[in-house]
Amino acid sequence: MSSVEKKPEGVNTGAGDRHNLKTEWPELVGKSVEEAKKVILQDKPEAQIIVLPVGTIVTMEYRIDRVRLFVDKLDNIAQVPRVG
């Protein structure tokens, strides 16, 4: 019998994730901005949440305190929100 635990969906346990915190939220695609913000801030209270239209060009620097929400024309989450 194996004692290896499965990695929960949406949790990054790799390099750069020193505290084993959730780094992406695939379950939020299609949800409203307000609902997404609420869930993300429960998981990552220090997150700086940036809301942008889907397709917006953004800088590539990685920030552990930032989560970008890309939204469609109805202000629903269009892409998986991720730390960065």
Curated annotation (Swiss-Prot):
Regions annotated as coiled coil: none
Disordered: region residues: 1-23
Keywords: Protease inhibitor, Serine protease inhibitor
Annotated positions for site Reactive bond: 60-61
InterPro entries per the UniProt record, alphabetical: Prot_inh_pot1 (IPR000864), Prot_inh_pot1_sf (IPR036354)
Pfam families named among the record's database cross-references: potato_inhibit
Protein's recorded name: Subtilisin-chymotrypsin inhibitor-2A
